[in-house]
């Protein structure tokens, strides 16, 4: 921030920040005091995750939009990344996308139920599955298990962090087997709520993506349980089947490039 005054007067800085407590207020005040046009860039909280970090994204979006207005920013730039492989289900983007539009348009906060209704209506053109609510509920997994890792979900970290000893030490310091089991049960309830509901084509594709994200998260939490129990070789899931499901979900929306 102290270097903001060194920027050319034609520069238009973008203040990036993705956590619920990112200091947009302080940073915006510094940049605005230099007389520069600027924007704030919150995030969807979806990357490096299988279910998103919806509560963090919600708070991050609210802070960005409110501080953009407070400090006279040109607006907000919603960011969604594919860091480390784009493993997130596409549908986890929708709540953040619609909520950022709501906040930028009139600045009014929304509770989750009307936002879920908006996702159902505007994205899926149907409320049969109430998929908007299920997406946001799955996005609470990290809060459910008491994890507050910055810029990633614990479930994603359990599957993709190669430093196993570091992961185990993190679990032993910050997690318990009970929390891991609670997280697995939490995800199972979402699956049960979705099962048997009628759906249209858009809902069906998004539901498949979400269920795959939930399955990957469950696999990860089971891996966490194994690490906590001292049995890291335990691997009960069917890896080839999961890879086939992931390939199918990927190719339903994207080109093959990046899949391998």
Regions found by a protein language model. Give the residues of each.
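Substrate-binding groove of N-acetylhexosamine-processing glycoside hydrolases
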Residues: 1-260
